[in-house]
Design a protein with these regions (language model features):
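Catalytic-site beta-strand/loop segments enriched in glycine and acidic/polar residues
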Residues: 118-152, 156
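Structural motif
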Residues: 51-53, 76, 132-134
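A cross-family acyltransferase "interaction/gating" segment
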Residues: 5, 143-204
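Membrane-anchoring hydrophobic helices of lipid-metabolizing enzymes
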Residues: 1-66, 72, 88, 95-96, ...
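Conserved nucleotide-cofactor-binding alpha/beta core module
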Residues: 78-127
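A conditional alpha-helix N-cap/helix-loop micro-motif detector
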Residues: 33, 55, 111-115, 142
Length: 243
C-alpha cells in the first residue's frame, strides 16, 4: 500500500508552490547550453507522442521540457508519500500526473497501481500525449533502467527520447539517486542534452539496455561538460526486482 503524506494540505500547497517558483527561477537565471535539439525538434514537429526518459536524479528540471512545445505531457509519479508533493508541483506546470510504477508488469510487485498506470500511459500516448518517465524510479537501482519503459514504448508504438541535464553550480544529494539540486546563480552554466530517439521493437530487453546505455552516455557527457564528476550507475549486482 502506498505511504500517505502526513503533511497538512496547506503545508503541501506552500511547499509545492515554492518548488514550482524555484524551478521557474532556475529556467530564467541559468545559461542553458542545449545539445541534441535536432532529435527533440524532429519528434515535436511530427506532432506525434513520444516518451521523455530521464534518470530520477535529473527529474527536477523536467518541467522545462514543456516550455518548448504546446503538446500536453503526462508523467508517471510514485504512489509513495513524496510522490504526492511531486505530483502537486507538476500541477503548477499543467503536467498530468499518473500515479504508479513503471516496473515490468509481468513481474510480481507489492506496489499497487502499476498495471493501471501503464494502461493509462499507453492510452495517453495513443491519444497524442507526450509521456515523461524515470526508468530507474521510484526507488532504483540508480541509473539502471527497468523494463517497464521499454514495454510502454512497444505497446504504445512510440519512440523514447533520452534526456538529461546538469549544472555547474549545484549540489548532489546523498540520496539513493544522487539527486542534482541546482543553485539559481545568474548566468551560471547549465547543459541540457537529448539523445537519439530509441525505437523499441519486439525485444523488450534489448530496448531496456539501449535506453539505459544511452541515458548513461549523455548523463556522463552532461556531467563532464559542466565540470562535475560523473556519478556512475549502481553496481549490476544491486539490480533486481525492487519492491
Amino acid at each position: 500500500m502506498a505511504r500517505k503524506n502526513s503533511l497538512h494540505p496547506f503545508v503541501q500547497s506552500l511547499l509545492t508552490a515554492a518548488a514550482a517558483s524555484y524551478i521557474r527561477l532556475l529556467n530564467r537565471t541559468l545559461r542553458w547550453d542545449v545539445r541534441g535539439e535536432e532529435h527533440h525538434e524532429k519528434l515535436i514537429t511530427s506532432g506525434k507522442a513520444f516518451i521523455y526518459a530521464f534518470w530520477h536524479s535529473r527529474l527536477l528540471m523536467m518541467p522545462r521540457l514543456q516550455k518548448h512545445h504546446n503538446l500536453p505531457i503526462s508523467v508517471l509519479i510514485s504512489e509513495h508519500g513524496d510522490g504526492e508533493l511531486l505530483a502537486r508541483t507538476m500541477d503548477h506546470f499543467n503536467i498530468i500526473a499518473r500515479r504508479g510504477s513503471a516496473q515490468n508488469p509481468r513481474k510480481k510487485q507489492k506496489q499497487k497501481g502499476g498495471a493501471s498506470a501503464l494502461k493509462a500511459l499507453v492510452k495517453d500516448a495513443k491519444n497524442g500525449i507526450v509521456i515523461g518517465l524515470t526508468p530507474d524510479g521510484p526507488r532504483g537501482p540508480r541509473q539502471r533502467a527497468q523494463a517497464g519503459v521499454a514495454q510502454l514504448a512497444r505497446l504504445a508504438g512510440v519512440p523514447v527520447l533520452p534526456t538529461t541535464y546538469n549544472v555547474k553550480v549545484g549540489k548532489r544529494l546523498k540520496s539513493w539517486d544522487r539527486l542534482i539540486l541546482p543553485l539559481p546563480l545568474p548566468f551560471s552554466k547549465a547543459v541540457f542534452i537529448y539523445g537519439e530517439p530509441i525505437y523499441v521493437k519486439d525485444d523488450i530487453e534489448k530496448g531496456r539496455q539501449d535506453i539505459e546505455a544511452s541515458l548513461n552516455h549523455i548523463t556522463e557527457k552532461a556531467d563532464l561538460m559542466v565540470g562535475q564528476d560523473y556519478s556512475p550507475p549502481a553496481p549490476l549486482m544491486a539490480q533486481g526486482d525492487i519492491s
